């Protein structure tokens, strides 16, 4: 591993506390990923990135800032990357997936806040996440009450911009989201000092569409009865996609897809024939939250799809590239992003439709619907999700968890029993 200590000091990180966080990462990566047999060779790229997750990309971002580019840290798949890229800005994800950050978050937030929100705030306040230290602006959105209030804390020492996501999907809501995107574009122009033109936005839309297509290719390979890659490896790929340079992400995902397609042609599977196929749905899973996938795939099943923000919601549906004016392009962006079926919407029948479609496409034997503890939206929506799946004859297991390992054995027992039931 390269030595990034000087870089971390220069951006004001608490290096000693950060060392404590980093000490557990090699063991976790080894247990979850490197211990797997017969992995695709293309996963070497993601293994390298995760081994230096707080070094490689942060160093690149700092070098780009020296050239005058601005970095925007985002929390949600509803923030349109295309707008930032069109102004020569850079988008990065932010830290939010480790129990390590939760105590620092609980120092200022209620304990009854979801772990993702507590970890986000804790990562920033503890000065142990380089992405929070580097970002010139944070961009939030109104998809969650916990995040909305957390943004007020996060915005105390770094500029914070919040996009107002409509809570319904009527024609007027899509038009209103288009106006929100246009307003965001003005703010991005102000921060970067660069004007967004039709041509620049067209290039950015195409760039992100190509990234979506590449990730879709990887997911399409998981529809095969011959399963060429584990769910854990795909989860890692998509988690890193939130941070990586989009052109490089596209290249690497296409390289992985090429290998997976070759594996399918040659009958190379990572699981024995007859392994039960699981779709995981619910709350997002940020780095390094691999707990559920690890338990499922070491309990005799395989994860073949994730209907979540760190899954299909991130890449399904392309933006229409035919817009001739900024107004048309903003509407095309609005129409695409409003197809993302987040639990913040009411009604949210689109998510049910997506799940029923994916069960067929990915040849799913059972669904695991998971919510983070105190995530009211996904916890409440479990009722209609479970009912719809059961009516369609699809076995479903509903779970609630957090980032701690204290419930790991309980989860293993319940998931193991669910997998046994699928074999009955």
Locate each region found by the language model.
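An N-terminal, globular interaction/scaffold subdomain
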Residues: 54, 62, 69-125
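Acidic beta-strand-to-loop metal/phosphate-binding motif
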Residues: 134-142, 364-373
């Amino acid at each position: 591993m390269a030595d990034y200590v000087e870089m971390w000091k220069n951006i004001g990180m608490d290096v000693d506390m950060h060392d404590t966080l980093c000490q557990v990462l090699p063991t976790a990566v080894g247990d979850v990923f490197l211990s797997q047999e017969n992995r695709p060779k293309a996963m070497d790229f993601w293994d390298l990135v995760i081994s230096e997750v707080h070094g490689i990309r942060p160093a690149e971002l700092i070098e780009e800032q020296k050239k005058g580019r601005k970095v925007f840290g985002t929390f949600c798949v509803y923030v349109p990357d295309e707008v930032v890229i069109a102004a020569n800005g850079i988008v990065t994800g932010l830290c939010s997936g480790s129990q390590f950050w939760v105590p620092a978050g609980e120092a200022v937030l209620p304990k009854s806040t979801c772990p993702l929100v507590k970890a986000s705030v804790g990562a920033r306040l503890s000065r142990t996440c380089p992405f929070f230290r580097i970002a010139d602006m944070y961009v939030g959105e109104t998809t969650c009450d916990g995040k909305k209030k957390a943004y007020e804390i996060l915005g105390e020492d770094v500029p914070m911009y919040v996009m107002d996501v409509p809570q319904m999907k009527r024609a007027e809501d899509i038009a209103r989201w288009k106006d929100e995107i246009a307003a965001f574009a003005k703010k991005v122009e102000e921060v970067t000092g660069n004007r967004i033109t039709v041509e620049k936005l067209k290039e950015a839309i195409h760039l992100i569409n190509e990234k979506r297509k590449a990730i879709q290719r990887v997911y399409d390979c998981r529809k095969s009865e011959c399963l060429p890659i584990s769910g854990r490896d795909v989860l890692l790929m998509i988690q890193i996609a939130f941070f990586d340079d989009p052109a490089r992400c596209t290249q690497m995902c296409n390289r992985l897809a090429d290998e997976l397609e070759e594996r399918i042609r040659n009958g190379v599977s990572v699981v024995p024939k007859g392994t039960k196929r699981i779709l995981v749905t619910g709350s997002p899973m940020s780095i390094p939250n691999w707990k559920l996938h690890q338990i499922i795939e070491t309990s005799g099943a395989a994860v073949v799809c994730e209907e979540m923000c760190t899954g299909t919601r991130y890449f399904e549906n392309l933006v229409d590239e035919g817009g001739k004016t900024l107004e048309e392009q903003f509407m095309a962006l609005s129409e695409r992003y409003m197809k993302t079926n987040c639990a913040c919407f009411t009604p949210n029948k689109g998510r049910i439709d997506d799940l029923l479609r994916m069960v067929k496409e990915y040849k799913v034997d059972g669904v695991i619907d998971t919510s983070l503890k105190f995530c009211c939206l996904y916890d409440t929506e479990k009722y209609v999700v479970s009912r719809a799946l059961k009516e369609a004859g699809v076995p479903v297991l509903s779970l609630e968890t957090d980032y701690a390992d204290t419930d790991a054995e309980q989860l293993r027992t319940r998931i193991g029993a669910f997998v046994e039931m699928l074999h009955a």
